[in-house]
Structure formats: C-alpha cells, structure tokens
Amino acid sequence: MIAMQPETQLKTALKNGFDPNILYKDPLTIVKEPMCTILEKHSKIPVDKVVSHVNKVRDRAFAVFPYACIGQFSFVELSIAASPYYPEMLERVKNGHKLLDLGCAFGQELRQLIYDGAPGESLYGSDIQQEFLNLGYELFLDRATLPESHLIASNILDRQSPLFTHLTGKLNIVYISLFLHVFDFEQQITVAGNVLDLLAAEPGSLIVCRVTACRDQGVLNATAERMPYYYHDRASWEQLWEVVQKRTGVKLCVDTWEQPDELVKKHPLPGIYILGSAIRRV
C-alpha cells in the first residue's frame, strides 16, 4: 500500500485551515548568482528579461502546488554547489557516474551541474509532479541539453513507478534537497530504503542531503495537525539512518553537519536550520 502522498497531505492541511498564502513572497526584483548567470549563459535569456521570466514561471508553479520552496523562490537559490561533497559529485558525474536529483522540482540543481561541465546524459531528475518537470524546461529553455527521458515523474514510495523500472541499481549518487520533511518518520525510513535500492549495490554509492531541521521538534512537529511533515534535529536524523541500516542490512557511513543557508532567514516556521549530510555505502 502506498503511503499518503504530498498532494494529499496538502489537501488535508488546507481542509484543517492551513493558508498557503503565507508561503507566497512578493515578485523578485533581482535574481541572485549563480542562477542569474546560468539563465543568461546556459538558457540564453537576455539579462533584462531574467527577473520577469523567473516571476512568471514561479506564479505558474505555485498555482500547481503551493510549496514553500516555490512561493519563496527557493528554487533560484541553488544549493548543491555549497555542499562539501559537490566537487566529488561533479567529478564522478564527469567520469560517467549517474546522479539522480530526487524531488528535483524544476531540476535547477541539475542545471548547475550541467553549467559546471557535467554531461546531461549522466543526470536524472524525479518529482511527483510532471508539471514541475515541464516548467523546468520553460524556466531553463534547454530541452536539447537534458533528455526528457531523464526527467521522471514518479512517487518514491511506489516501487512500481517508472523511477524503479528504469533506474533500480543503476545510480551512483542521489541528491535530496528540502524533500524528506514532507514524509513522516516511518515514511522517511521507507524512502531511504528505496533510494538505496536505486543505487548500485557497491561501496561508494552516495546519498547527499540538504535537510530542513528544527531546534525544538516538540513545537515544530506539532504543526503536523495542519501540515503533516516531520522535521529532524541532528539526533533524529542519525537515528533514522541507524534504523535504515538495521532494516536493510546495508552498512553506511553517515556524515552530518549544520550549514548556513538563506532559507533559514525567510522560513515562516520558528527554529528552522539546515542539516547537510552524506551517506556512503561501505
């Protein structure tokens, strides 16, 4: 049985009084680097059109699914290159390893990799919303660069979905940013196990995460009454991977750190911070 999906969670939250407009930020007046340069150089958008282009795509996306990362323009603040594991990720992909951005939204982090020299044929993205993947092409204007067959609309909890049909055991790296918190703790264990199955069953297979965490779980996770998410702290994150190892029998080396992030400054919920983590198969 497939567990509750994010869009079902949102419908439940709206019914319980959650107002998505608190997640909607006024239109941008400037697009920060490196996104601005990527849109100019990679997407060939004239510099004087970049801001209006981004605003239009954001509004269309927020109408499809009102996530905070969309309403607050988090998708223009690229994060993958800030990971201390990015040099390894980029080098491995340049050498033929395959990388999946899970919960990729517009696939913006994939475009960072491509801009930095990664071949599009080694990159994959997946999101539950096909419209997000389509809007990614509208944002970056690059259908010729990133194969459409490499952007897969799937539910990571559904092992019969195209993601598993096409990629089980074939990936070397999975990047997960601001995605896992939309699942409860038990569902996150399932997601982690499924991700391990997508990766090659060999030492060095790597998961790199950017995780929404909180200082006071008791307070913040109480928001589950309206938006049933699960926010980690460092201890619960480490516990998650201990459980995953016990249930799967796969030995993992888990590296975790707290990292500065622009998201923290504008997140509407209290006590938010960002955990970075790398989970390597031993």
UniProtKB/Swiss-Prot annotation:
Species this protein is from: Emericella nidulans (strain FGSC A4 / ATCC 38163 / CBS 112.46 / NRRL 194 / M139)
Function per UniProt: Methyltransferase; part of the gene cluster A that mediates the biosynthesis of austinol and dehydroaustinol, two fungal meroterpenoids. The first step of the pathway is the synthesis of 3,5-dimethylorsellinic acid by the polyketide synthase ausA. 3,5-dimethylorsellinic acid is then prenylated by the polyprenyl transferase ausN. Further epoxidation by the FAD-dependent monooxygenase ausM and cyclization by the probable terpene cyclase ausL lead to the formation of protoaustinoid A.
Official protein name in the record: Methyltransferase ausD
Biological pathway: Secondary metabolite biosynthesis; terpenoid biosynthesis
Highest classification ranks of the organism: Eukaryota, Fungi, Dikarya, Ascomycota, Pezizomycotina
Other noteworthy facts: In A.calidoustus, the austinoid gene cluster lies on a contiguous DNA region, while clusters from E.nidulans and P.brasilianum are split in their respective genomes. Genetic rearrangements provoked variability among the clusters and E.nidulans produces the least number of austionoid derivatives with the end products austinol and dehydroaustinol, while P.brasilianum can produce until acetoxydehydroaustin, and A.calidoustus produces the highest number of identified derivatives.
Listed InterPro entries: Meroterpenoid_MTases, SAM-dependent_MTases_sf
Enzyme class: transferase
SUPFAM superfamilies, per database record: S-adenosyl-L-methionine-dependent methyltransferases (SSF53335)
Assembly and binders: Homodimer.
Similarity remark: Belongs to the class I-like SAM-binding methyltransferase superfamily.
Gene Ontology molecular-function annotations: methyltransferase activity
Cited Gene3D superfamilies: Vaccinia Virus protein VP39 (3.40.50.150)
